[in-house]
Curated annotation (Swiss-Prot):
Protein family according to the UniProt entry: Belongs to the MsrB Met sulfoxide reductase family.
Catalytic reaction(s) noted: L-methionyl-[protein] + [thioredoxin]-disulfide + H2O = L-methionyl-(R)-S-oxide-[protein] + [thioredoxin]-dithiol; [thioredoxin]-disulfide + L-methionine + H2O = L-methionine (R)-S-oxide + [thioredoxin]-dithiol
GO BP, one annotated term: innate immune response
PTM info: Truncated MSRB1/SEPX1 proteins produced by failed UGA/Sec decoding are ubiquitinated by the CRL2(FEM1C) E3 ubiquitin-protein ligase complex.
Name of the protein in question: Methionine-R-sulfoxide reductase B1
Main function: Methionine-sulfoxide reductase that specifically reduces methionine (R)-sulfoxide back to methionine. While in many cases, methionine oxidation is the result of random oxidation following oxidative stress, methionine oxidation is also a post-translational modification that takes place on specific residue. Acts as a regulator of actin assembly by reducing methionine (R)-sulfoxide mediated by MICALs (MICAL1, MICAL2 or MICAL3) on actin, thereby promoting filament repolymerization. Plays a role in innate immunity by reducing oxidized actin, leading to actin repolymerization in macrophages.
Subcellular localization, as worded in the UniProt entry: Cytoplasm; Nucleus; Cytoplasm, Cytoskeleton
Domain MsrB: 1-106
Amino acid sequence: MSFCSFFGGEVFQNHFEPGVYVCAKCGYELFSSHSKYAHSSPWPAFTETIHADSVAKRPEHNRPGALKVSCGRCGNGLGHEFLNDGPKRGQSRFUIFSSSLKFIPKGQESSPSQGQ
């Protein structure tokens, strides 16, 4: 059973081009393609953020080991972080809605922090 409802449209689930995923609302850098990995859930999965402040986290009620994540700059809802559920022992799995992301191909980044 999935933790989130799936309505389709997850265009970045099987997207593995080199580049950076930024917040669709404000353009702040969130995840690198280097931290993206294939996962059985229908949402794009990442192991880590680009910056320590890329995302804000708050506990998910009645769900130990799960945190709601939002953009660290504008507060746009992104999805969840599942602690110790990544591809390697001790890694997290960030399960992120494609609609909350914009992809910037490698070489087309405009600055170290998009949207400034």
